[in-house]
Amino acid sequence: MDVNPTLLFLKVPAQNAISTTFPYTGDPPYSHGTGTGYTMDTVNRTHQYSERGKWTTNTETGAPQLNPIDGPLPEDNEPSGYAQTDCVLEAMAFLEESHPGIFENSCLETMEVVQQTRVDKLTQGRQTYDWTLNRNQPAATALANTIEVFRSNGLTANESGRLIDFLKDVMESMDKEEIEITTHFQRKRRVRDNMTKKMVTQRTIGKKKQRVNKRSYLIRALTLNTMTKDAERGKLKRRAIATPGMQIRGFVYFVETLARSICEKLEQSGLPVGGNEKKAKLANVVRKMMTNSQDTELSFTITGDNTKWNENQNPRMFLAMITYITKNQPEWFRNILSIAPIMFSNKMARLGKGYMFESKRMKLRTQIPAEMLASIDLKYFNESTRKKIEKIRPLLIDGTASLSPGMMMGMFNMLSTVLGVSILNLGQKKYTKTTYWWDGLQSSDDFALIVNAPNHEGIQAGVDRFYRTCKLVGINMSKKKSYINKTGTFEFTSFFYRYGFVANFSMELPSFGVSGINESADMSIGVTVIKNNMINNDLGPATAQMALQLFIKDYRYTYRCHRGDTQIQTRRSFELKKLWDQTQSKAGLLVSDGGPNLYNIRNLHIPEVCLKWELMDEDYQGRLCNPLNPFVSHKEIESVNNAVVMPAHGPAKSMEYDAVATTHSWIPKRNRSILNTSQRGILEDEQMYQKCCNLFEKFFPSSSYRRPVGISSMVEAMVSRARIDARIDFESGRIKKEEFSEIMKICSTIEELRRQK
C-alpha cells in the first residue's frame, strides 16, 4: 500500500511537524582512524582567525605563541578573535551594576567549595590525558598515576586528600628541574612453542624509570590530548575535541564552579539548568519582552548561531574576567582561579595518533606518528594534508602543536556563557540610550536575541549594535546562519518555541529501545524512558502504549525470551518452555524468563520484580533474588542506578532508574584481548588499585572515611586499623591469643616490606 507522506501532516500544525526533519533516527556517524587531520584543522583555523595578533615565544618551552588580544578592530564580517580587554572589563562592570553583589556572593560560595573539595572529585569524568604514559586513561587511573609520580618526587601535600593541596603539588612540580616517571613498555621475542613446535611472538611487559626535564614536563603538563567527536548528527565533517590532563583539570573545575555560581543567578543563562527548569527560565524572558513591547513596539527574535565560538574565545580574556570578578577577594583565591586561564594561554594540542599509510602493491601498512610530522618529506601526502602540515610546522614541538589562542571544545562552558550574557545585559534601555533595546538567552555558544523597537529601522539598528558589540569581545554572530522572526517563534538549544515550547520528540528517539546492559537494567531503563517522555515530551497515551508494546517485542527478540507458550523457536526456547510448564503462577515469571508482560502506561514507575512479586511461585522468588547465586557477580545493590541514555544531540545524559538487583543483573566480563597488549600493565595497576580500595572498604565502615587516593596511605591506614580492631577483639574475648599474635605478626611483615620497597 502506498502512503503519501504529506497526508500524515494534514491534521498536524506545522510547528509540531518540525521534529520530523531532524537527522535523529538510525545510527549516528562514528569516526574511524586518527583525529590528527581534524586537530590540525582546529589549530590552523584558530591561528587564522587571530593572524593579525602579536607573536611571542614562551621562555620556558620555546613554543611560539600568537596573542590577538587588543588586536586590530575587524573591518569586515569575517570571524575574528581580536577581543578588546577594556570592552570585556566594561561589560563585566555593567553586569555587576545590574546585579549588585553577584560576583561577591559567587566568590564566597566558590571559596567554600574550594576548601571542601576532595581530590577524588577528579576521578569523575571519562577519558583523561595521562601525562605519565602520554595517552588517554580512565580518570581514576590517570589521577592515581599522577599522585604516585608526585609522591616518588617528594610532593606529598595531596595526601591530605584536599583538591587544593593536590593543586599545590601541581604548582610545585612545575618548578622542579626534573621529574622521574615510571613508564610501561613492551618487549617482543620469538620463541618456539613446546606444544605446537611453531615459532610464536612472546610479549612481556616491563616498567622502566625515566627522567623528564623541566621543559618536557611543562609541555606534558600543558598538553591537551585530542580525539574525534563521535556520534555527531547532521554534520558532514567530523571535528576534534580535547581531553586535558590532571594538572589542568582541578584548576578548570574551580573556575567553572565560580562561573556556574554566577550563571545560576543570571536570568538569561541557559546553563547550568536543563529540561523543564530551563524551559521555564526561557519562557520568562520571552514573556518579559512581549509584555514590555507595548502595542506601539515591534518585537523580533533572532535564532542565533555563532561562528567558531571556541576558536575565537581567548584564555587571556577569561583571565581578565576572573581578575575583575575576584577583585577585593583574598590573594590565594585570586591566584588559584587565574591559573587555569594562564595554563590555557600556554596550552599545547597533542596531534593524536598520526597518519596511517598503506601500499596496495606491497600490502604494507605503516604508521607515521605525529612526532614525525615536523621532519617527514611531504611528497607522501596529498595536496590538502600537505598544506595543513606546512601551516602547522612552525608550531610543532615534540608532536604537539602550540595553541595559545582559542579554547578547546567544552572547557569553559560556564565562563563563556557569563561573557555572552554580559553582552545581552547591555541591551537595557538605560545602556542603549535610544529607542531600541534587547534581551535574550545564552547557553555556551548558542543564543537567542530578542530585539524591541518602535519600527523596523530600529530593529535593524539594534541587531547591528548587538553584532558589533559582540565583535569587541571575540564573539562572532553568523549573519548567514542566524535568522530573524516575529517574537513568539524561535529555536534555542534545540527547544522550539512557538507561543510556548513545542515538544521536539524526535530528539528522544535514539534513547528508545533496548540498551544492552543486562536483562534487569534494560527492562527498567526501557519503561523509564517511556515514562519520562510522557511526563516531559508530550508522548500521548496511545503512542506510549504502542511504544511499550514495541519495546517489549524488541526486548524479547534481543534476549530471545519469547513467552513460554509461543511457537517461536530460539536457542533459549527449550529451557524457557520447561520453566513455563513447571511454574504454577505463570503471570509471576519475568518477561526475561518467558513470562507475560504486565506493564501498561499506568504502572511504568514500578520495577518489574516488584510488580510481579506477589504473583511469583515461592521457589521462583528464592531463585530470582538470591545474592549467593554463583552465576551472578553483583554490583553493590543500590535502590537507584544511573543509566547513560543517548539523546539525539548533546552529551549522553545520565538517567535514573529503579534498580532491583536480581540474578538477571549480571555484569559482562571484560574483553580479554587487552591482556596481550602493552596496556596490560596499566590494566593490572588499575585492578590492583581497585582491589586495594575494596579491601580498604572492608576495614572501614563507609561512614568513617572518604575514598582515599593513592595506595601507600591506604596501607598505613589499614595496618593501624587492623591493630586497633585486633586489640579490641582480643580484650573483649572475641579472638584467641594465637589469632591476636598472628594478626600482629602480619601487620609487622607488611610494614617491613614497605620499608624495603
From Swiss-Prot:
Which EC class is this protein assigned? transferase
Q: Where is this region: Promoter-binding site?
A: 249-256
Catalysed reaction(s) here are: RNA(n) + a ribonucleoside 5'-triphosphate = RNA(n+1) + diphosphate
Q: Does the keyword Amino-acid biosynthesis apply?
A: no
Q: From the UniProt record, which GO molecular function terms apply?
A: nucleotide binding; RNA binding; RNA-directed RNA polymerase activity
- Gene Ontology CC: one annotated term: host cell nucleus
- Start and end residues of each stretch annotated as Disordered: 52-82
Q: How is it modified after translation?
A: Phosphorylated by host PRKCA.
Q: Where is the composition biased (Polar residues)?
A: 55-64
List the Pfam families hit by this protein, alphabetically: Flu_PB1 (PF00602)
Q: What is its EC number?
A: 2.7.7.48
Q: Looking at the record's lineage, which domain of life comes first?
A: Viruses
Q: Which PROSITE patterns match?
A: RDRP_SSRNA_NEG_SEG (PS50525)
Q: Where is the RdRp catalytic domain?
A: 286-483
Q: Which family does it belong to?
A: Belongs to the influenza viruses polymerase PB1 family.
Its function?
A: RNA-dependent RNA polymerase which is responsible for replication and transcription of virus RNA segments. The transcription of viral mRNAs occurs by a unique mechanism called cap-snatching. 5' methylated caps of cellular mRNAs are cleaved after 10-13 nucleotides by PA. In turn, these short capped RNAs are used as primers by PB1 for transcription of viral mRNAs. During virus replication, PB1 initiates RNA synthesis and copy vRNA into complementary RNA (cRNA) which in turn serves as a template for the production of more vRNAs.
Q: Which HAMAP family match?
A: INFV_RDRP (MF_04065)
Q: What is this protein called?
A: RNA-directed RNA polymerase catalytic subunit
Originating organism? Influenza A virus (strain A/Kitakyushu/159/1993 H3N2)
